[in-house]
Regions:
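Active-site-adjacent helix/loop segment of glycosyltransferases
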Residues: 204-309
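Short aromatic/hydrophobic "clamp" motif used to bind/position activated sugar donors
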Residues: 81
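A recurrent flexible, glycine/aromatic-enriched loop bordering the glycosyltransferase active site
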Residues: 126, 132, 136-142, 147-176, ...
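Glycine-rich, basic loop-to-helix element that forms the pyrophosphate-binding segment
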Residues: 59-76, 86, 97
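A short, conserved alpha-helix in the catalytic core of glycosyltransferases
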Residues: 158-217
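Short, acidic, metal-binding catalytic loop of nucleotide-sugar glycosyltransferases
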Residues: 20-29
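Conserved donor NDP-sugar-binding/catalytic core segment of glycosyltransferases
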Residues: 88-139
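Single conserved hydrophobic/aromatic residue that forms the stacking wall/gate
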Residues: 317-336
Length: 336
């Protein structure tokens, strides 16, 4: 069985379209779990009335994407879990290719579909594309999207491949491995928690794949606006939290210092543009990291217990010397 877990906070209209699409899925053995993160609208009442066949988990507060998914996983009956954003719709045949790919190799622990833009359906989605990668300074990008540039889907990525991370927009994982890796780290709340999870999977010697035969469409930035203070804060904080928490100590300190300098440059650049949401997001991220060393250290200890693969053996992207200045400048000035 496949358990489809949808964390949700407000927006009945968004969730309604997602559920109507899901129920057209051409795959018989699945269940739908909606985890309500203490919505303040009529989401819970609507689900109980119009979708009584769905498993509903009601949280006492908003635990974010990470916490919502973890609580959904606890009640899941399937051997495979699919974590799915509520602002997605799915191709009718989206689920079977993911299951087939997962069944093909016991070392595959997570897999994502091809994720396209909901509003312009020949365009790769910002949040997922066809599989995520990350450079050594923890700047993430995807096949189909480099920073702010999204490619048109012309079939150029229609081959299933390994990747560094699967997008939390729509990702399938093995339930037993998810539990072994301790699930999503709830410190993240939202944004990059799936990258952190996939990093742990890699450290355990497991593989992440992208399966473009499966297609999902994503609206993006419905629950949190693209240029909001909170989004900036979580992106900047969580990238540095991963870097400091997951690398070996000396490498974390070395790369952490370089990333800190780049963050300062990004902050100054945002000041020049009078982009105060971005400025305050970066400063708030620094503030959190400065005053939570214990939580960072505890994260390092948890990661170390799982590690079977050294840093040098991880499939992180190393940018070549000739293109590095251009790449770094683009990463800093376009960082969202």
């Amino acid at each position: 069985m496949v358990s489809i877990i949808i964390p949700h906070w407000n927006g009945v209209d968004v969730l309604s379209e997602c559920l109507e699409s899901l129920k057209k899925t051409r795959y018989s053995d699945y269940e739908i779990i909606v985890v309500d993160n203490a919505s303040t609208d009529n989401s819970v009442e609507w689900i109980k009335k119009d979708h009584s066949d769905i498993i509903l988990v009601q949280n006492d507060k908003n635990y974010g994407y990470a916490g919502g998914c973890n609580r959904g996983a606890k009640v899941a009956n399937g051997d495979y879990l699919v974590f799915l954003n509520n602002d997605t719709i799915q191709d009718q045949d989206w689920l079977a290719p993911l299951v087939r790919r997962m069944n093909s190799d016991s070392n595959i622990v997570a897999i994502q579909p091809k994720i396209l833009n909901y509003f312009q359906r020949d365009l790769f989605d910002y949040a997922g594309g066809t599989g995520g990668h990350m450079d050594i300074l923890c700047f993430p990008f995807t096949r189909g999207r480099m920073f702010l540039n999204q490619e048109v889907d012309k079939g150029q990525y229609d081959t299933a491949e390994t990747c560094f991370w699967a997008s939390g927009t729509a990702m399938m994982v093995r339930k037993d491995s998810f539990k072994m890796a301790n699930g999503f780290d709830e410190i993240f709340f939202a944004h990059m928690e799936e990258i952190d999870l996939c990093w742990r999977f890699h450290a355990m010697g497991l593989d992440i794949w992208s399966e473009p035969e499966s297609v999902v469409f994503h609206k993006n930035a419905v629950s949190m606006p693209m240029y909001s203070h909170q989004k900036y804060y979580l992106n900047h904080r969580n990238a540095q939290l991963m870097l400091l928490g997951n690398y070996s100590l000396l490498l974390a300190l070395y790369l952490g210092f370089i990333r800190f300098i780049l963050e300062l440059i990004a902050c100054v650049y945002a000041m020049v543009k009078l982009d105060w949401n971005h400025v305050t997001g970066i400063i708030r991220a620094f503030w959190w990291l400065l005053f939570h060393p214990h939580q960072i250290w505890q994260k390092r200890k948890r990661f170390k217990k799982l590690r079977e693969v050294k840093d040098n053996d991880l499939s992180l992207i190393h940018i070549s010397e000739p293109t590095r200045p251009l790449y770094i400048s683009y990463a800093v000035f376009c960082l969202k």
